[in-house]
Amino acid sequence: MSRRKQGKPQHLSKREFSPEPLEAILTDDEPDHGPLGAPEGDHDLLTCGQCQMNFPLGDILIFIEHKRKQCNGSLCLEKGVDKPPSPSPIEMKKASNPVEVGIQVTPEDDDCLSTSSRGICPKQEHIADKLLHWRGLSSPRSAHGALIPTPGMSAEYAPQGICKDEPSSYTCTTCKQPFTSAWFLLQHAQNTHGLRIYLESEHGSPLTPRVGIPSGLGAECPSQPPLHGIHIADNNPFNLLRIPGSVSREASGLAEGRFPPTPPLFSPPPRHHLDPHRIERLGAEEMALATHHPSAFDRVLRLNPMAMEPPAMDFSRRLRELAGNTSSPPLSPGRPSPMQRLLQPFQPGSKPPFLATPPLPPLQSAPPPSQPPVKSKSCEFCGKTFKFQSNLVVHRRSHTGEKPYKCNLCDHACTQASKLKRHMKTHMHKSSPMTVKSDDGLSTASSPEPGTSDLVGSASSALKSVVAKFKSENDPNLIPENGDEEEEEDDEEEEEEEEEEEEELTESERVDYGFGLSLEAARHHENSSRGAVVGVGDEGRALPDVMQGMVLSSMQHFSEAFHQVLGEKHKRSHLAEAEGHRDTCDEDSVAGESDRIDDGTVNGRGCSPGESASGGLSKKLLLGSPSSLSPFSKRIKLEKEFDLPPAAMPNTENVYSQWLAGYAASRQLKDPFLTFGDSRQSPFASSSEHSSENGSLRFSTPPGELDGGISGRSGTGSGGSTPHISGPGPGRPSSKEGRRSDTCEYCGKVFKNCSNLTVHRRSHTGERPYKCELCNYACAQSSKLTRHMKTHGQVGKDVYKCEICKMPFSVYSTLEKHMKKWHSDRVLNNDIKTE
């Protein structure tokens, strides 16, 4: 379009090639064309050059029809600036005659024609030129970059009757083929003769104005601005994004006010982009040359015209990507050029680059899969998806067999820290002592913090757990049941525990490690303090050795209870010298007094050889063999050479009963060192309230075992040592006020309701009334059975059946574990039946 269509007045630039001064022309034009120009800032009017009629910019089609048929003005024939010397007589024919269109022009005319293409001189506007704009085309140019001389483009080619009507036909000068329209001629010239005149729109409307990329080489035409002439250095990487059509358009369009002066480096080109498929066909040498020589890259792009692309590619991101690279490295055969990397389209699954930031390294815990998974949190083995990456890491260990979490007290290993935490409760019975550093550098038990009383108990609970561990190892009937229960619980709770967060896992690791460290440090200190390894044949030191092994001698309650028990033993064994020895049995002589006890006496009483053997058993309860005392390596093992009689098994709990009674007695004598505000904060706070009239604890005195003998749960030793428990005593509530029916008679734990106590009591008795009908699973709680039944199948989900025992499973990994556990001798087939 001319500048008059944009509402701009005529302004002639200073040119050197005009043979006559232009001032006279300007003075003649200004009075005639005074009303042509719209206001300087108005851009929405089109003015006819002949009749001075204004048209809105939206009515450009009406303006074109006006120029074709209705405008009969004579101004277009009078003012002819920059004419050639004289038109030939052949060119003076009427417009109704056929017109031949030349495709080649001489280099002398190239300068003038290219200058006139910028809309400075001509007074006529050719209909074919308007049709090119109407169909989304730019003005055609020849192979040398000049405009193709279409009929009536300027006054020198059709001086008569151009504004009246369009020529009847157009003839190609190369093949002499006539055409009825200039548009058909342009299509013929581009498709048949290979001239690159315009760009075809794939998705746009024909009425959408497009800016075409001229195909001529711009080096020969001095009027065309160079590629890198818009204030950009030659070695700037942003020159790679400069397109010849856009540069020439910006250079001329910005100067004429057609386009808003937006910064070219941070706004995408309006309507057309680079075609990545054509750029990839360019050679590496051409791309390297284009990096350093933008004019050569201009030739490459013009020789390889590019089809239009939908405006979906974000150039601003690619500009930021190139922001840090000011120079291009030398090209190698295996490495794509910078331009190829720039123009490579974004992949659908890839993340677009931003500021050339390198991608983060992958997680160390997740092995890289052979093929990128569809979802980042899906298992590459079975395809199961997870919410959190930590759950995927834990689940992947079920396929790889990795078990990074190992118990410090036994050889148990698991895949989750929460499972290790649950396993540690079998050692601790849900009461692990918090460990702190004492003055001598050893880990000792400290008072629990508020709010942690349910999880943190006293060291005597750990003592009982070791006793129970010893019983389970020596009783063959308990081993399969406990082992199966633990493994079945692992299987049934796997799916629920996969939803736990990493913070909980980290916290549980820290607590479990502290508990294991305290027990191992106690074992190590027990061996180093003696100076010699305890042999298998050493017996008769059960109580002092337990004190040293569990680091209980430094705790005030256990130390006082220990003194009382030793004092009672001393009184019974030496009746004649009871008072004298009681004064000398102070803290310094406790270990020596325990060493002077005969091998045939336990707790100050005579006993049979079988009973002495059981007394020696209590000594071996926590000490273990010398080979198992290396820190953080093996479990606390008992000597296999020591054969335990079946009748002596219940005697192992006598030690625990005595300690429990002594602890309760010491709490009532004086203010305790560990102050508990509520009776529920200590497992032993209400144990003294369950006392019978003879002073013995209820749970430690079954019927028929009060009259002598160490076998069973005898509490005579503890009853004799605590004669004051029968009365309320100072600071102790009465038995009616303090007694509660929801207190466990085995460990003294207090519950809010009786149903919880009933379930808890089954952990001591081993009762499991809820059994699965499909497998041998049994549990003490109905909710656990309900959760377990979900592992066998749920409504609306696939069920995987074992081919051997036909047991159903809802998760395939659970079936794999079942096959490894029960049918490890058979190979698991891949074609598992699903229903």
Curated annotation (Swiss-Prot):
Entry's localization field: Cytoplasm; Nucleus
Record field: compositional bias (Low complexity): 682-696
Effect on the protein upon substituting residue 123 to R: No effect on sumoylation
Residues engaged in binding Zn(2+) 1: 48, 51, 66, 71
Tissue note: Isoforms are expressed in a tissue-specific fashion. Isoforms 1, isoform 2, and isoform 3 are expressed at similar levels in testis, kidney and spleen. Isoform 1 is expressed in the stomach, and isoform 2 is expressed exclusively in the lung. Overexpression following proviral integration in hematopoietic cells results in the generation of myeloid leukemia.
Mapped zinc finger ranges (C2H2-type): 170-193, 377-399, 405-429, 742-764, 770-792, 800-823
Covalent cross-link site, Glycyl lysine isopeptide (Lys-Gly) (interchain with G-Cter in SUMO2): 123, 164, 620
Chain segments carrying region Required for nuclear body formation and for SUMO1 recruitment: 1-210
Modified residues (Asymmetric dimethylarginine): 271
InterPro entries tied to this protein: Dev/Hematopoietic_TF, Znf_C2H2_sf, Znf_C2H2_type
Feature: compositional bias, Basic residues: 1-12, 421-430
Crosslink site: Glycyl lysine isopeptide (Lys-Gly) (interchain with G-Cter in SUMO1): 634
Gene Ontology cellular component terms for the protein in this record: cytoplasm; nuclear body; nucleus; SWI/SNF complex
Zinc finger region(s), C2HC-type: 45-71
Name of the protein described by the UniProt record: BCL11 transcription factor A
Biological source species: Mus musculus
